[in-house]
Regions:
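Intrinsically disordered, low-complexity terminal regions
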Residues: 1-149, 154-157, 167, 176, ...
Length: 250
């Protein structure tokens, strides 16, 4: 089901630095889906593009249905593949002037891409591989959720998730006022993380390299478990409050 929420537009303009700007409208389309357990957000082109004022918001559905609110655009391809909602930013047909096509990597800036997903409690996996597209997860209550993020921030706010998995490439993870009994962070992909007014039971960390500058924040978790992927992997943790360190074999 697709409902028009208003008149929409896309505008292009050239900047002073010979780059081109694609501006998405804030007028939205509403699309309804059923049986969604996973969301995949990605870009299909390989051109040098960067995003500004762009994010994907995941919020709870009030009636058990999954809905997507997105700008109307020829560059957004939206579909459902089995239980996966697929959102593709496809800029391969972006029309450049003939002289610009001679450059190996034309510059393109995409502004104002705002996606909102109303998800039910069955959502279990979210992947966002568009660089610069921030991920916000607000008010979600579910048993488990796995996220894979490409070079961007994922922010969790006012959520209750029994088991949360975070990995990807160059991820910044921040949790605010959330309850997470089991938090799993893959440090090969999670660049840094912060916990703010949260209740976390066990924090599971894994990785294959040497990780410095990991400061255990006050009240961050009740227990931390380090599981290296390689024998020479090293985790450095700074503790600033009273605690107990227990070493044990597998």
């Amino acid at each position: 089901v697709i409902l028009m929420a208003g008149v929409v537009y896309i505008s292009f303009q050239k900047s002073d630095r010979d780059s081109y700007i694609l501006t998405f409208s804030d007028k939205l389309l509403q699309t309804e889906f059923s049986g969604v357990r996973a969301v995949k957000v990605y870009a299909s082109d390989t051109r040098h593009a960067w995003l500004e004022q762009a994010c994907v918001n995941v919020v709870p559905s009030t009636d058990g249905k999954t809905r997507l609110f997105s700008p109307e655009s020829e560059y957004l391809k939206i579909s459902q593949d089995a239980d996966t909602l697929v959102i593709c930013l496809d800029l391969t047909n972006y029309d450049l002037p003939e002289q610009k096509k001679k450059y190996l990597i034309p510059g393109l800036q995409a502004k104002g891409l705002q996606l909102t997903i109303e998800a039910d409690a069955n959502l279990a996996f979210l992947t966002n591989t568009i660089r610069g597209l921030r991920t916000n997860i607000n008010g979600i209550k579910t048993d488990s959720l796995a996220t894979h993020i490409q070079s961007g921030e994922v922010r969790l706010d006012s959520c209750e998730i029994r088991a949360l998995y975070v990995d990807g490439d160059g991820v910044t993870f921040n949790a605010h006022q959330s309850i997470i009994p089991y938090l799993y962070l893959d440090l090969d992909g999670v660049r840094n993380w912060g916990v703010h007014e949260c209740t976390i039971g066990t924090e599971h960390l894994t990785g294959s390299e040497t990780y410095h500058r990991n400061e255990l924040q006050k009240g961050e978790c009740k227990k931390m478990i380090w599981t290296p992927k390689k024998e020479d992997a090293v985790l450095h943790v700074t503790m600033k409050e009273k605690g107990c360190l227990v070493l044990q074999d597998e």
